[in-house]
Amino acid sequence: QALEANKFFVVFEPDIQNNLSRMAQRWGDDYNRNKLDGIRAMVFCNGWYANQVSNADPDMLALCPLHITLVEQGGSTRILFVKPSAVAQGSEAEALAGELEQAVADAIAAALQQLGDSPAAP
């Protein structure tokens, strides 16, 4: 919801752990050696940023769609996000990528704030 409130369109929300679990028998002892409880992702994009990135440097369209990965382990969740500013270093889209990165970081912070304000939050 926080991504959509910040004008990012969530395209897909795969349950990666569920998909990987289908391979547990085939992979045997090599399956989930880190004992992760869950892996989910959110694939999203903002049309305005996609247009601006394509205008600045079409090669940076690799940034769209963006994704966040949520890794659950031992009762906590880590949020993983590849920083667009790192990908766009030296590109004509570098400044825009930094702006995009900040917009996503703000959306993540808003989501965490909402969770912190929730009565169900620990």
PLM features: residue spans?
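Ser/Thr-rich, low-complexity intrinsically disordered terminal regions
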Residues: 1-59, 66, 94-111
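Beta-strand/loop substructures that line and gate deep hydrophobic ligand-binding cavities in soluble
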Residues: 64-94
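Short, highly charged C-terminal tails/helix-capping segments
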Residues: 114-122
